[in-house]
Design a protein with these regions (language model features):
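Eukaryotic, polar/proline-rich low-complexity intrinsically disordered regions
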Residues: 1-185
């Protein structure tokens, strides 16, 4: 069993806490999404009694999606993106590649073709660099389908893009005219 698999429950709960519900363990995030490591560990022990700094460091180091980051002095931790809470990640606008991809479940295709990609409860729409990653994302929600996003045209039209610390591209919305359904399994 890999270290990532070993701490899967803790990692999923950490994601919930740092992205959506810090109050679930009685902590708060600052305006940039950071939580104090010592307070987080202390309060995580209520749900996972053996939780420790070593386990937290293993989760951060082995997470295949690089969901989390420590502050430079390792006293704080945050999720790299995916928040439903209002946080400012201090990301700078970036020029995106010519195209990016978005994976979703087939049941959402009709709505997306009509209304485009919306951030829903998150702060941004998440886009992937490649079809394989987008397919994995889509498969989490059911039968996956992939949209190709014409990010070059979007950027030229004034849409702003950000690149998160773990390589996920973020934007506020993707109107239907910039979408092309490329995989419909």
């Amino acid at each position: 069993m890999s270290k990532e698999e070993k701490h899967k429950k803790e990692s999923k709960f950490l994601s919930l806490v740092l992205r959506h519900h810090p109050e679930a363990i009685g902590i708060s995030l600052d305006t940039h999404g950071w939580a104090e490591v010592n307070v987080l560990i202390k309060n995580m022990k209520r749900k996972f009694p053996v939780f420790s700094l070593k386990i937290l460091e293993e989760i951060v180091a082995t997470d295949s999606k690089q969901r989390y980051a420590f502050s430079e002095d390792n006293t704080k931790i945050r999720a790299n993106q995916g928040h439903s809470l209002a946080v400012t990640l201090e990301l700078q606008p970036q020029t995106p590649p010519e195209c990016l991809y978005h994976g979703t479940a087939s049941r959402f295709v009709e709505s997306i073709l009509k209304s485009g990609l919306q951030k829903q409860t998150r702060q941004h729409v998440h886009l992937s660099m490649d079809i394989a990653t987008a397919t994995k994302v889509g498969a989490r929600h059911g039968k996956p389908v992939i949209f190709k996003v014409n990010t070059k045209a979007m950027h030229k039209a004034g849409y702003v893009f950000y690149l998160s610390a773990n390589g996920v591209w973020l934007t506020d919305e993707v109107p239907p005219k910039f979408l092309n359904l490329i995989v419909n399994n």
